[in-house]
From Swiss-Prot:
GO terms for biological process: symbiont-mediated perturbation of host apoptosis. Keywords: Host-virus interaction, Modulation of host cell apoptosis by virus. Transmembrane segments: none annotated. Disrupts the host mitochondrial membrane potential and induces apoptosis probably by inducing host CASP8 and CASP9. Induction: Expressed at 72 hpi, barely detectable at 48 hpi. Residues 93-140 are annotated as: Apoptotic activity. It comes from Crimean-Congo hemorrhagic fever virus (strain Nigeria/IbAr10200/1970) (CCHFV). The keyword Acyltransferase does not apply. Changing residue 126 to V: No effect on the induction of host caspases activity and apoptosis. It comes from the Viruses. The record marks 127, 135 as: Important for the disruption of the host mitochondrial membrane potential and the induction of apoptosis. This is Non-structural protein.
Amino acid sequence: MLSALALSTSSLCLSRYPLRASTVFLASSNIPFPSVSASLARPVATSAIPERPDLLMSPHGGLKAMMYLPLTNSLHQSTCSWLTGPRGFSSPPLFRIRFLLLIMSDSISLTDITISPGTLYSARTLLLRAAVLALTRKPMSFLHFKAACW
């Protein structure tokens, strides 16, 4: 299986700079970081983010990143894209992440997740939220999905 969870606003691939599953990323750059931390996420030092080549800011404030999620003996690929609006928001909007989840059985489920800008999320938190939504849309074994994405 391929080995990446890609978050991007374009087809840019950042596989040279993998992040760990425990790495927390910012959902939007509209709010200075660090900001509110999700209960399952670990805050990241402000000075550590701008210099990192694996974290690139999109022109409209989204964040592009590559994360690796460990499986038992391999890694599982999921592709995400930021769905953001133009610049000049009068108030911080909600951002949506679209997950294209390639399950181990080769079935595909498309899942949208709405998140608040300025909030820190871990890769595991986002993937678990995607799993819950995907399971409500497409019948599959939860244990099978969990084995593929945990």
